[in-house]
Amino acid sequence: MNINGYTRMAAVVANPIKHSLSPFIHNLAFDLTNENGVYLAWEVEAEKLPAIVDNVRTLDMYGLNISMPYKTEITPFMDELSPAAELIGAVNTVVNQSGKLIGHNTDGIGFFNSLEKYHFNIQNKQMLILGGGGAAIAIIAQAALSGAKKIVVAARKSASYIPLKEKLEKLSVKTGIEILLTDLSEADRLQKELKQTDLLVNATSVGMDGESLPLEKSLVLPEKLLVVDAIYKVRETPFLRWAKGQGAQTENGLGMLIGQAAESFYLWTGKKMPVAEITLEMEKEA
């Protein structure tokens, strides 16, 4: 990395963020593509967000990545939102276009781009996704925008279940895609939906302990099913081991992590991130 008077900045903004892998990914991408940029991690309090946004314009930055807890809080500061960001109601990438700040959400498109190596396209396919948090909503919204045939969301019945149901109903109306919510504990219903499923995704945190499964292990998976776990800190979760044991193709969350970064990098620089090389380096770091 050769920092000089022409070097431009990008940064990830969150709290906490010092543990983030994003600086490693993006700075390696800058080096590999000969792009004169540097990427930092900024851990800031919520009241500093307006100043951070002003910095993007003042310092002519590429833009920002936004992580928890600011993905929704940052949206009012944007001049424009991409279709995905507007649909999701959250921004994870800010792009500076000559002072005009455009909010994008690359989580969903990054997720599906990471599945291209399996020649998987969600169009006219059915997805069953476990969980209803931010990552799940981004994946659901992108699946709907990409023309999925049907999306089934399985979540635990809790205080957030009814708000999730209402959010999914709005997504369904806006996109014209069938999106259903079911109780994650209803194994019979899940088994019925699994028979028609092409893509099974775990977007919960269950499995981070290396022991827990997010669903009943008695469930039988159909043939030719692609199974993905959004967790990347545990490279093969119990969920993926269980699916692999039934003959399914499996993918961990590292692809989504790098995929969303690659989409942000392209929006900032117009260059394709060398995903294969970066994935290899990330695996060495594990």
Curated annotation (Swiss-Prot):
The lineage of its organism: Bacteria, Bacillati, Bacillota, Bacilli, Lactobacillales. It catalyses: shikimate + NADP(+) = 3-dehydroshikimate + NADPH + H(+). It comes from the Bacteria. The keyword Lyase does not apply. InterPro entries: Aminoacid_DH-like_N_sf, NAD(P)-bd_dom_sf, SDH_C, Shikimate_DH, Shikimate_DH-bd_N, Shikimate_DH_fam. Homodimer. This is Shikimate dehydrogenase (NADP(+)). NADP(+) binds at residues 131-135, 230, 253. The gene is aroE. Belongs to the shikimate dehydrogenase family. The active site is at 71 (proton acceptor). It comes from Lactococcus lactis subsp. lactis (strain IL1403). Involved in the biosynthesis of the chorismate, which leads to the biosynthesis of aromatic amino acids. Catalyzes the reversible NADPH linked reduction of 3-dehydroshikimate (DHSA) to yield shikimate (SA). Keywords: Amino-acid biosynthesis, Aromatic amino acid biosynthesis, NADP, Oxidoreductase. Pathway: Metabolic intermediate biosynthesis; chorismate biosynthesis; chorismate from D-erythrose 4-phosphate and phosphoenolpyruvate: step 4/7.
